[in-house]
Amino acid sequence: MNTKKMLAVLVSVAMCGAAFAGCGNNADSSKAESKAESSSSQVEKMPETDEEWTQAMYDKAMVSYGNTSMMQNVIKKAQSGEKVTVAYLGGSITEGISAGADGCYAKLTYDYFAQKFGTGDNVQYVNAGLSGTPSKLGILRLDRDVLAYEPDICFIEFAVNDGTETDYQNAYESIVRTLLQKNITPVLLFSVTENDHSAQDYMKQIGEFYHLPMISYCDALRYLFANNRMTWKDFSDDQSHPNTEGHKLVASMVDYYFDTVMDVAPEGDYVMPTDTVFSPREVDAHMYEGDSLTPTSLGSWKEGSTIASFTNGWTYDNTGDNSPIVFDFKAVSYTHLTLPTN
């Protein structure tokens, strides 16, 4: 079977949803913990059929179910007809570059969740994906772009936009802790680029510490590539963004999580650790724009901006005398976001 056909088979089998997941279900209570390494003395049996390869892909992707009681409670809430909001925070992959707003994994998995667990129009959708943005900007956007909609679930996708330095680690953990403090269920999604860049290692540390659900299409793709089941060009038309079929493949991994999470034994109410992994000093960070912070002096700046979704800031006027814009406020720490206009 060639690689393009393999991708089509993986997607078509995955879209069978619960019918496929119900056969040979591996979602027992042991999967609530991160999967353990196989014994070095035991030879791994390689998949043979297309169905076995698909299941192996899901097993690689499903890093951890975490504390399942959080997601199970949200699912029960949706099934009862109450309003449930599913949010997605990330970069251009989440935004839908290469696949479009309706073809991205976020919209596909929201649709699947709404159809599987919703009772009509009670499940709402928030896509807070923004091209080129890492978790350092994600924590600043979190309040405006996610929390304002009071979500019950928030997927976090920053593995290819983040580096591995401490400021990324602190920001990512700050996002996680802020969501947990507000009783929002985080789901960590790990991506990868053509040159195999992914910041998932430190993100997995955070996910394990907070006992969160983690889905790694990075691990799944590495497994398929290593076994010649598909190539990067089957998955993407550039260096980092899934193409239309790639988004369907990623969505199938998330759908598998939705299909199986109710079968994993719950562990009781979630309790957030008081300790931290890194130094999440940006917890509860807030982004101030022109409607909420007034400068004491504009200097060589003017009100308004036209950069991406940041349209309520200030723009530097290089025809002026180069005098600074001045603000007066109190804060534990602050970050100023400066973007080029061309």
Predicted regions and their residues:
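Active-site segments of SGNH/GDSL-like serine hydrolases
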Residues: 157-161, 170-205, 209
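Conserved small/polar residues in nucleotide/adenosyl-binding loops
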Residues: 334-341
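Extracellular serine-dependent O-acyl
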Residues: 187-190, 198-235, 248-263
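Sec-dependent signal peptide cleavage junction
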Residues: 19-39
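Sec-dependent N-terminal signal peptides of Gram-positive bacterial secreted proteins and lipoproteins
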Residues: 6-24
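Glycan-recognition and processing domains
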Residues: 263-328
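Oxyanion-hole/transition-state-stabilizing segment in secreted/luminal serine hydrolases
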Residues: 87-89, 95, 99, 135-169
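Histidine-centered active-site loop/cap adjacent to the catalytic His
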Residues: 47-51, 231-281
